[in-house]
UniProtKB/Swiss-Prot annotation:
Interacts with activated GNAQ and GNA11. Interacts (via the DH domain) with POPDC1 (via the C-terminus cytoplasmic tail). Interacts with RHOA, CDC42 and RAC1. The keyword Cytoplasm applies. This is Rho guanine nucleotide exchange factor 25. May play a role in actin cytoskeleton reorganization in different tissues since its activation induces formation of actin stress fibers. It works as a guanine nucleotide exchange factor for Rho family of small GTPases. Links specifically G alpha q/11-coupled receptors to RHOA activation. May be an important regulator of processes involved in axon and dendrite formation. In neurons seems to be an exchange factor primarily for RAC1. Involved in skeletal myogenesis. PROSITE patterns: DH_2 (PS50010), PH_DOMAIN (PS50003). The guanine nucleotide exchange activity is autoinhibited by the PH domain.
């Protein structure tokens, strides 16, 4: 009778051949090492009586393939997921009377095709394990090997899963497995989205939990140090300087305690509100910029009294952290917001949610820390007689090798390293002084020179060098002073050239706008408190990126938490979102140009006064 075709003859035969050699090695203890290939090829056969005779005498002919599968002994035919009777009887004959193998599992009529196959595979595994123990010095002979109950019905061998799958045939199990894989593909995608959503909620929970901890830390400063100092008084040498130590941290604490923390907790019920929460309070977060601007002065005062007066207060209050460790918390927190928002955005996008507003929120929280860092650098600038806050927003700062003009307007023979600050109204050249406080971590700067934007000129790519450019200053008598700047990176130089060119272009636009003041006022009203021009952001109508000069629509409010400052045409009434304590909606129907309304928040009366913080308090 012709044996049935095998599903995958090449790969299956190779695996079966190796498996047969392993079984043959188990049945013949005298054979060690890998079997030798038969020179006669796979067609040579050996009778069963010859095999038994060789086992008894211990002799074998070298030209006979000892491990080759034999048609009458243990050849395996796979068809419809079952083993043939000849294969089962061959296994029974292979075990022999002295091997101790029971003939029941390998009887010509097995209990079931899969059960018989599993027992056959288990016998192979058991033989190999016993052989390993014998080689390691333990006693035991091959004749005494028995098939113990190591495999129960329904249990599979993990090491032999691939082989079991190949031997089950193409009938009832192969095709359903493929169909199951195809049917599980969308299910796995849904599970991945569900898992990503769970991770995003975990990040949101971490944001809320760390916000509570942050509020407690600020409370130790306001309700601990500041309250105690107000009750007991301060030393004479510290009187009048205690406000420099704490800055506006009380305003930050009250806003987080009475409003922001409660809003974050509501986001646990509605995660989509998280992005709007940060976008809405972009202007309120300007408190951190003011705090960071005062931070270098606070460090200077704290360095004089930190080891004496404030240490006594810490021990009196029983606080674990020192005051300078608590005062750095707002700086760390404003950086933490952007990291948590980025993680939330990553998982929320994987969950298939709309992340357009989240991307805007991340951009806001990347811009605010940059402004904070700039203000901390400016707080360490000494020797400038003017008021830095009157010079407009800080557009950039970098270190250059500057060749400055000397007496007579001639350039110096060598360049000097300078820290250059670019404002809207002035460019300041300063020299780094090294460590700026205790520990020398932050450098201080001393003022050297400056150029007013009204007298500024630009020469880019000097001598074809992309790292070099020149800034010129027109003197009161018509003379020109020239500063040659060389950056370490061409990208830095080109960014400065572009930024200065935009400033000069804006200056020309301003002169042209003098002929039309109303149009100029409309354009300037698109700038919010952080100095970020309004306009379309990428993927977001009504907002723009920092430094973008595109003019925004006059109908688009910049910040929903504040009244609109835009000039509207006569007769047009637009609904304006007021601060939370005075929010009122107009009865006039909303025009197509109005911005979408933000979710209504029930604000307790204790929170209302925080919404009245004006520009001077910030």
């Amino acid at each position: 009778m012709k044996p049935p075709d095998r599903p995958t003859p090449g790969r299956t035969d190779r695996i079966l051949g190796v498996m047969g050699g392993m079984l043959r090695a188990c049945a013949v203890p005298g054979q060690e090492g890998p079997p030798e290939r038969d020179p006669l090829g796979p067609g040579s056969t050996k009778t069963e009586s010859d095999c038994i005779e060789e086992d008894q005498t211990g002799q074998r002919e070298p030209e006979v393939l000892a491990w080759a599968p034999q048609p009458e002994s243990y050849s395996i035919a796979v068809s419809e997921g079952s083993m043939s009777a000849s294969a089962v009887s061959g296994l029974a004959a292979l075990s022999g009377p002295s091997s101790g193998l029971s003939s029941d599992p390998c009887s010509p009529i097995p209990p079931g095709p899969v059960t018989g196959l599993r027992r056959w595979l288990d016998h192979s595994k058991h033989c190999l394990s016993v052989e390993t123990e014998a080689e390691s010095g333990q006693t035991g002979q091959c004749e005494n090997w028995t098939l113990g109950p190591t495999l129960t019905t329904g249990q599979e061998l993990p090491e032999l899963t691939l082989l079991t799958t190949l031997l089950e045939g193409p009938g009832d199990k192969a095709q359903p497995a493929e169909e199951e894989t195809l049917s599980q593909a969308p299910k796995n995608e849904e599970e991945q989205k569900k898992m990503a959503l769970e991770r995003s909620m975990f990040v949101l929970g971490e944001l809320v939990e760390t916000e509570r901890t942050y509020e407690d830390d600020l409370g130790q400063i306001v309700e601990g140090y500041m309250a105690t100092m107000a009750t007991q008084g301060v030393p004479e040498s510290l009187r009048g300087r205690d406000r420099i130590v704490f800055g506006n941290i009380q305003q930050i604490y009250e806003w987080h305690r009475d409003y922001f923390l409660q809003e974050l907790q509501q986001c646990l019920k509605d995660p989509d509100w998280l992005a709007q929460l940060f976008i809405k309070h972009e202007r309120r977060l300007h408190m951190y910029v003011v705090y960071c601007q005062n931070k270098p002065k606070s460090e200077h005062v704290l360095s004089e009294f930190g080891d004496s007066y404030f240490e006594e207060l810490r021990q009196q209050l029983g606080h674990r952290l020192q005051l300078n460790d608590l005062l750095i918390k707002p700086v760390q927190r404003i950086m933490k917001y952007q990291l948590l928002l980025k993680d939330f955005l990553k998982y929320y996008r994987r969950a298939g949610k709309d992340t357009e507003e989240l991307e805007q929120a991340v951009e806001v929280m990347c811009f605010v820390p940059k402004r904070c860092n700039d203000m901390m650098s400016l707080g360490r600038l000494r020797g400038f007689e003017g008021k830095l806050t009157a010079q407009g927003k800080l557009l950039g700062q970098d270190t250059f090798l500057v060749t400055e003009p000397e007496a007579g307007g001639l350039l110096s023979s060598r360049g000097r390293e300078r820290r250059v600050f670019l404002f809207e109204q002035i460019i300041i050249f300063s020299e780094a002084l090294g460590g700026g406080g205790r520990g020398g971590a932050q450098p201080g700067y001393v003022y050297k020179n400056s150029i007013k934007v009204s007298c500024l000129g630009l020469e880019g790519n000097l001598q074809g060098n992309p790292c070099r450019f020149a800034l010129t200053s027109r003197g009161p008598e018509g003379g020109i002073q020239r500063y040659v700047l060389q950056a370490s990176d061409p990208a830095v130089s080109q960014a400065w050239i572009k930024q200065v060119a935009q400033i000069l272009e804006s200056q020309r636009d301003f002169l042209n706008a003098l002929q039309s003041p109303i149009e100029y006022q409309r354009r300037e009203s698109q700038t919010n408190s952080l100095g970020r021009p309004g306009g379309p952001w990428v993927g977001s109508p009504g907002r723009m990126r920092p430094g973008d000069l595109a003019q925004a629509s006059m109908h688009t409010p910049i910040n929903g938490s504040l009244p609109s400052l835009l000039l509207l045409p006569r007769g047009e009434v637009s609904r304006v979102l007021l601060p939370l304590d005075t929010q009122a909606l107009s009865d006039t129907p909303q025009t197509p140009h109005d911005s979408p309304a933000l979710p209504t928040v029930n604000t307790p009366p204790c929170q209302a006064r925080l919404a009245k913080l004006d520009e001077d308090e910030l």
